[in-house]
Regions:
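Transmembrane helix-loop junction
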Residues: 31, 43, 74-78, 114, ...
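Helix-loop-helix units of permease transmembrane domains in multi-pass membrane transporters
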Residues: 26-60
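A residue-level signal for alpha-helical anchor/packing sites in multi-pass solute transporters
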Residues: 28, 37-40, 75, 111, ...
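Residue-level recognition of membrane-helix boundary sites in multi-pass small-molecule transporters
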Residues: 49, 120-121
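Secretory targeting signals
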Residues: 1-20, 25, 55-118, 126, ...
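Hydrophobic alpha-helical segments typical of transmembrane helices
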Residues: 25, 36-37, 108, 150
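Terminal transmembrane helical anchor/hairpin motif
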Residues: 1-3, 128-205
Length: 205
């Protein structure tokens, strides 16, 4: 019961996360656009920090969604089934790994929202959700592609940990994969912050 419920949570959350991030990033970008074509944050002397603050805000919302949904699942399983040796620690570790895998999408979707608009951000988020749903139906294809496609990171790494309740997984260097995902997020975030500091805005239609 615990394993099946956890796998369902991982799959459903991995499909929701891209569209959730896409919508939130789209709304954030649209608010700045409507407030004056990004003039407020672009004219700030700390425009890079302002962009970083928006990214951290989105990460905070994402973290709340993931933690809340996992705690809801944990409490539900505990109250209904009362399984033995079912502690909160593995659930929290699963949540942390899920969040690490999702981080890359935040600066990416925020950049899409600012550069291409709210519609593009939401559209790419929807495509990410569809892609996760599709690729999860083909395990062999998923195994070959997941490391190079950020939308699959949460699904794969979280599933690997949850099914083994360990970072030591035969045939997979899970700590290295998580480190690469986190470093990729940091590098992208730095790159987008530097881009935004020099961005001159876009014409408002």
């Amino acid at each position: 019961i615990v394993m099946n419920s956890g796998n369902y949570w991982i799959t459903i959350s991995a499909m929701i996360a891209p569209i959730l991030i896409g919508i939130l990033a789209g709304i954030t970008g649209e608010q700045e656009q409507e407030a004056g074509n990004y003039q407020i944050i672009r004219k700030s002397t700390h425009r890079g920090m302002n962009f970083l603050a928006k990214a951290m805000y989105l990460i905070g919302i994402l973290t709340f969604f993931v933690v809340f949904s996992m705690l809801l699942l944990y409490v539900s399983i505990w109250c209904i089934y009362k399984p033995e040796n079912y502690t909160l620690i593995p659930a929290l570790k699963t949540t942390l790994i899920f969040i690490v895998g999702s981080l890359f999408l935040v600066p990416f979707q925020l950049w899409i929202s600012i550069y291409l608009g709210m519609g593009a951000s939401i559209g790419i988020g929807i495509l990410g959700t569809i892609f996760v749903s599709y690729i999860s139906s083909f395990p062999m294809l998923e195994e070959q592609l997941w490391r190079v496609i950020p939308w699959i990171w949460t699904l794969k790494t979280t599933t690997l940990y949850f099914e083994n309740i360990s970072l030591s997984v035969q045939g997979v260097n899970l700590p290295l994969d998580l480190a690469i995902q986190f470093v990729s997020f940091v590098l992208l975030l730095i790159g987008v912050v530097l881009w935004f500091k020099n961005w001159e805005g876009k014409s408002k239609e």
